[in-house]
């Protein structure tokens, strides 16, 4: 079979021009490090404000992953409980496809798996170095707990240490009995009740509403949580009891991650690692910056916390710690024992 050569018709010349131009553009522009794929957007949520450390993490991750993938993957972040999804409900919300993922404070997730209560056990961790090591040792356990629910761990955020915001100073254990306090998980509610306080576990936005209605006079949270919510409008004392150095966990649905091409998956992993690193670096100055803002807004930071107050709270913390040990794996208990030896 013989083929006739192409005639130099006007249409043929146009084809050649288009082809030549396309080749030139490809050579000039070059190929992106991540091949283009169908645009994807992950809807992510947190119950905390954008300026809170949880919100900062979502912002950092979103910007980094968008940059890494040349805008092919972006995040749509909902802050300050905009979607009415508390940390306790967040795993289920992702499974139900209301969100793709988010950043959840870990303590309330204990209702899904007890391992998530590790970082907020009372007085278990007393330094950032210990908190970082505990998070690293527990990471495979967090990953496993999420994986069984079709979810993937992205990064861990370590929070500033927990204290008590109150309308009156806490000078002795008797002052604890006068508190109507919001706590951030079931264990902390049990501890506060054991010292005589009226305690209720609530998402922070619900607690602030009750604070405005004078149904609460204290909130258990970090300086970071309080600054982001401007708790100084109602509570003028902060006692840094160092109750815990807790974490929040950022995650996404595994099927969303699996739908990405391998190159994009690698960039997501890189963005998550970079976010976790930058979140930890924030802690170096975060507490000092928070305290400066608190003092400038009339908050008395009553440090050091009275030893008798700490002793009463530590004694009350023994029961929830024992209960937690009874329902977790040997691997989890080993992490707790290690932390106790490195106070």
Where are these regions (language model features)?
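An acidic, glycine-rich surface segment that forms the CoA-thioester-binding/catalytic face
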Residues: 136
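C-terminal segment of classical bacterial N-terminal signal peptides
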Residues: 19-20, 25-35
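N-terminal secretory signal peptides that target proteins for export/translocation
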Residues: 1-14
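N-terminal secretory/targeting leader peptides
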Residues: 19, 37-130, 139-343
